Each structure stands twice: as C-alpha cells, then as structure tokens.
Amino acid sequence: MYFILFIAFLISQRLSELYIASRNEKWLRSQGAVEYGKEHYPYIVALHTLFILSIIVEYIGRGQTDIDLIFLLLFALLLLFKFWALSSLGKYWNTKIFRVPGTGPVKKGPYKLFKHPNYFIVICEIAIIPLVFHLYYTAIIFTVLNAIMLMVRIKVENKVWAE
C-alpha cells in the first residue's frame, strides 16, 4: 500500500513539474526565448519514464519490501531543496533549456552557491528514490544512465550561457 501511495505521489509530482514547465515555456517563448538541446530532450523524457517503470517492475519482481525511513527522509529533504531551487528560478525554470536574449543565468537562492543545484537534486533523487524500497538495480542502472545524460545536458547548457 505504501508503495502505491509513493509511486502515485512521485508520478503526480513529475506531472506537476511538466505542467509548470509547459506554462513557463509559453512565457519564455513570449519573451523571445530560444530553445537549445532539442536533440537530447526526448532521451531525458524516456530516461525518467523508464526510471519510474523500472521502480515498479523491480518492486513487483522483488516482492514487498520494507520502507527505508532514512532514504524516505532524504527524499523529503530533496523535495524541500528542489522547491527552493525551482522557486528561485521562477518563470525561468524549465525541463528544457531556454535562454531569453539579453539575460544571464539566475543568481539567487541556491544558484548563488552552486552552478547547477537542480541537477544535483536530480542526481540524488535518481539514486535515493529506489533505495526507499531497497531497489538496488534501478538505483545503480539509472544513476549511471542519468550521469551520462547530464554530462550531455550540462555541456549544452554551459555552452548556451557562455555565448
């Protein structure tokens, strides 16, 4: 039962993020924003979709497992940090890479301290979420795949902001 509630929450959270990103995209485009990294974006969507499916499949394959409260607490802390990061970006936050001409990177909230705090959060989420239910294969495989994907994405984003 806890697993179903957790997955429902996770999916709802991700869909909410996509809704916010879609709304922000409309605003960004109205400001003349240019999108970058279109080539790799479908792979990011696929990675995150397969991540959730892998959690479900591995959980079913393992049978019911106990919840690791330490990892659940870490996930809750990540959500707070994510809220801070996303709210600091405001309408500039998106799951895609956009740049409004004449603007620089946002430098408030955690972005004063780190160059890519949201990517740090995503790295931790991909590793920690499966560990809430002791799903080690999903944690390892998707942490590696996500690291590869983020190397591509961060390279593109850094190039965009260097222009």
Regions picked out by a protein language model, each given a short descriptive name:
Residues 12-15, 46, 76, 114:
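Alpha-helical architecture
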Residues 38-51:
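Interfacial helix-start motif at the membrane-water boundary
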Residues 20, 48-63:
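Membrane-helix exit/interface motif
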Residues 4-9, 73-77:
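Membrane-embedded alpha-helical segments that form the functional core of polytopic membrane enzymes
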Residues 21-40, 66-163:
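Cytosolic-biased juxtamembrane loops and peripheral soluble domains of multi-pass membrane proteins
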Residues 9-21:
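N-terminal signal-anchor/start-transfer transmembrane helix
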